[in-house]
């Protein structure tokens, strides 16, 4: 076992919270994020003064961790504001685990917040993509539409297969009172297929929600976790992999970096895909869960279009049980909400 795998079971999530999910007029992104932090600490039974590691990323703050620590009035020994998009917070979990295990810090908080829906617009610190900007794509949906179109072509999938992902997500949301679409009723394949086109083959209901929302988790070492108020959730396996940022640089439009990172995360954990009772995936668009299920090893390449028929409440493989980004909440960067669920 290499050195990085030594973080297996050495740290745990001991508190978690979300705040302002849906529409929260009058709140700033920072206020929402700070509220989630306080609630997560309360869930853990830990005082704010004990937080010495802070991790945050948003689309609105170039130095999110510094801004949040200033707002909270704390002076962390370790801060990380790395922003790699919606997966930033999964990367923060790994960095926090290493910082905790090496003794750099004792208590880590990972946080995110956005008021993009109630603010009525989208502000971003993201720079233009040099090989794509001249073509004026509607990002990020154009990128995922390219991946979806290629998948449909290469594996004989249909738009109805994409629609099934949205239908299953809504079915889960109907069971979740916290979900933004909880009271909106079920979806049918025809509902999704007949929704307003966005970028072919994706329509409006193939795309994630636009909501406000904030989330936070608290992590500590396993030896301290047993003293916290909530039941610890131990980190058993984690990994990262990055191939590209621009869709034009993606080596294979139907294969994500989860193919590599998933194998290493499972190896670290000592488990395999068939051991999983539930799966939480980033579903910004309906193509995502299909690709991730394949790349993570839950089925062979090209078989995801069939497996997704079994991911709803009546199926055999519970996926995105909150309703996911398609029907529960999606305030711009969804990764931390996947972790919470």
Regions found by a protein language model. Name each.
Residues 214-222:
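Conserved beta strand-loop-helix elements of the APE1-like EEP
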Residues 91-92:
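Active-site histidine-anchored catalytic micro-motif
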Residues 86-88:
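Short helix-initiation/N-cap motifs at beta->coil->alpha
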Residues 224-228:
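Short helix-loop capping/hinge motifs at secondary-structure junctions, enriched
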Residues 107-111:
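Short, well-structured beta-strand segments enriched in hydrophobic/aromatic residues
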Residues 1-82, 98-102, 112-208, 215-216, ...:
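Conserved "HGTGT" condensation-loop signature of ketosynthase/thiolase-family condensing enzymes
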């Amino acid at each position: 076992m290499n050195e990085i795998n030594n973080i297996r079971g050495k740290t745990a999530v001991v508190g978690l919270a979300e705040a302002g999910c849906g529409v929260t007029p009058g709140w700033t992104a920072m206020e929402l994020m700070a509220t989630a932090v306080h609630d997560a600490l309360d869930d853990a039974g830990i005082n704010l003064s004990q937080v010495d590691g802070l991790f945050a990323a948003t689309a609105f703050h170039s130095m999110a961790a510094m801004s949040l620590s200033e707002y909270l009035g704390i002076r962390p020994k370790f801060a990380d504001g790395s922003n790699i998009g919606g997966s930033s917070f999964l990367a923060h979990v790994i960095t926090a685990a290493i910082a905790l295990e090496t003794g750099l810090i004792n208590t880590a908080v990972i946080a995110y917040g956005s008021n993009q829906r109630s603010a009525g617009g989208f502000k971003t610190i993201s720079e233009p993509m040099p090989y794509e900007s001249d073509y004026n794509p509607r990002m990020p949906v154009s990128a995922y539409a390219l991946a979806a179109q290629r998948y449909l072509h290469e594996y004989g999938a249909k738009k109805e297969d994409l629609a099934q992902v949205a239908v299953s997500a809504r079915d889960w949301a109907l069971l979740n009172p916290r979900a933004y679409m909880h009271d909106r009723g079920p979806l049918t394949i025809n509902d999704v297929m007949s929704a307003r086109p966005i970028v072919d083959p994706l329509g409006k209901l193939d795309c994630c929600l636009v909501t406000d929302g904030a989330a936070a988790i608290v992590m500590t070492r396993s030896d301290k976790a047993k003293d916290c108020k909530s039941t610890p959730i131990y980190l058993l396996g984690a990994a990262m992999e990055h191939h590209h940022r621009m869709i034009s640089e993606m080596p294979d439009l139907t294969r994500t970096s989860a193919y590599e990172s998933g194998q290493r995360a499972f190896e670290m954990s000592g488990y395999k895909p068939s051991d999983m009772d539930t799966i939480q995936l980033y579903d910004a668009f309906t193509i995502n869960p299909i690709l991730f299920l394949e790349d993570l090893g839950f089925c062979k390449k090209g078989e995801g279009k069939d497996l997704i028929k079994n991911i709803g409440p009546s199926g055999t493989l519970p996926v995105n049980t909150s309703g996911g980004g398609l029907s529960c909440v999606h305030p711009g960067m969804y990764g931390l909400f996947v972790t919470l669920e």
